[in-house]
Regions:
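Histidine/lysine/aspartate-rich catalytic loop segments that bind and position anionic ligands
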Residues: 68-94
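Catalytic DNA-binding helix-loop module of base-excision-repair DNA glycosylases/AP lyases
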Residues: 76-80, 113-120
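Residue-level detector of extended alpha-helical repeat arrays and alpha-solenoid scaffolds
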Residues: 3, 38, 42, 73-74, ...
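Non-membrane alpha-helical segments in proteins
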Residues: 1-12, 40-47
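Ligand-binding pocket scaffold of soluble enzyme catalytic domains
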Residues: 2, 8, 77-84, 124
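Acidic/negatively charged segments and metal-coordination signatures
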Residues: 11-12, 47, 51, 55-58, ...
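Short inter-helical turns and helix N-cap capping residues of alpha-solenoid HEAT/ARM repeat scaffolds
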Residues: 29-30, 38, 68-70, 106-110, ...
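Internal, hydrophobic cores of structured domains that mediate oligomerization or house catalytic pockets
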Residues: 17, 21-66, 72
Length: 245
C-alpha cells in the first residue's frame, strides 16, 4: 500500500523526476499495471501522470502509442493529456491535433484505447474528429457500452465552450490527497475502526447488538448506472459527468 501513497504524493508535489520512471513502470504489458496499482490505474493514473509531467507530453504519448502496453493504461494516458489542457498547461488545439493523428496511428482493432480516444475527443469537443469518429464506430472499434454515438452527438451539441467547461468540472491534477484517495476501501475500513474505538471509549459497545456489530456494510442509496442521467442535473449521462473514468 505504501507505493500507492507514494504515487499520489509524487503527483501532489509535482515531482517531475518521477515521470520517466512511472512511464517505464506502467508501460509493462499484460496485467502488471493492475497487479501493482489496482483500480488506481483507471481511477487516477492519467491525472497522476499529468501531475508529474511538468507539461511534457512525451511520456504519455509513448504509453499511448506502445501497442505492448496495457490497453487501459493507453486509454488513461489520453486522459492525462486532457488534464494538461484543462489545467492550462497545453492548448486544446494541440491536443486535438494529436488525437486526430491517433485515428491513423492506433491499430485498427477494438480495445480500451479506442474507447479512450472517443472519450477524450468528446471531452474537448469532437467537431474536428467527427468524421474519423464515425468511421471508428462504423468499424466497431469503439465499445458503445463505454461511450455511444449519442454521447458524441451530445458533446457536439454543447459547442466548444460548453464542452470545455464541462471537462473542467472534473479534477484535472492531483491537488488534495484526501479527496483523491478517499474512494479507496482501506480508508473506509480505517474509518470504521476509528469509529469502533470511539464507541468503546464512550461505553457504547454494550448497546450494540451482535447482529448489528457483524452486519456487512451496504450501500444506503441506489447505485447509479453509468448510462443513467447524472443525479446533479447536468443533462449528461452519469458516466460522462460524475463517474470515475
Amino acid at each position: 500500500m505504501i507505493h500507492i501513497y507514494a504515487l499520489y504524493a509524487l503527483a501532489l508535489f509535482r515531482e517531475t523526476r518521477a515521470y520517466p520512471l512511472l512511464v517505464r513502470i506502467f508501460s509493462r504489458p499484460g496485467e502488471f499495471p493492475f497487479e501493482l496499482a489496482g483500480d488506481v490505474v483507471t481511477q487516477d493514473l492519467g491525472r497522476i501522470l499529468a501531475s508529474v509531467s511538468g507539461g511534457d507530453v512525451s511520456g504519455m504519448i509513448a504509453l499511448i502509442e506502445n501497442e505492448q502496453s496495457n490497453e487501459w493504461v493507453r486509454s488513461v494516458a489520453m486522459d492525462g493529456l486532457v488534464a494538461l489542457v484543462t489545467s492550462g498547461q497545453r492548448t486544446r488545439d494541440d491536443a486535438v491535433a494529436y488525437f486526430l493523428q491517433l485515428f491513423h496511428k492506433l491499430e485498427r482493432k477494438p480495445g480500451a484505447q479506442w474507447d479512450g480516444l472517443a472519450h477524450v475527443c468528446a471531452d474537448l469537443w469532437p467537431q474536428e474528429a467527427i468524421e474519423e469518429l464515425g468511421r471508428a464506430y462504423a468499424d466497431g472499434l469503439v465499445d458503445t457500452g463505454s461511450i455511444d454515438w449519442q454521447d458524441i452527438e451530445q458533446a457536439l451539441a454543447l459547442g466548444q465552450q460548453g464542452a470545455m467547461q464541462h471537462a473542467r468540472y472534473r479534477d484535472s491534477l492531483i491537488s488534495d490527497l484526501a479527496k483523491s484517495m478517499g474512494w479507496m476501501q482501506c480508508f473506509h475500513d480505517e474509518a470504521r475502526e476509528n469509529e469502533g474505538e470511539r464507541d468503546s471509549e464512550e461505553n457504547l459497545l454494550e448497546s450494540l447488538s451482535s447482529e448489528y456489530a457483524t452486519a456487512p456494510i451496504r450501500r444506503t442509496t441506489p447505485k447509479i448506472g453509468r448510462n443513467e442521467p447524472c443525479p446533479w442535473g447536468s443533462g449528461q449521462k452519469f458516466k460522462k459527468c460524475c463517474a470515475p473514468r
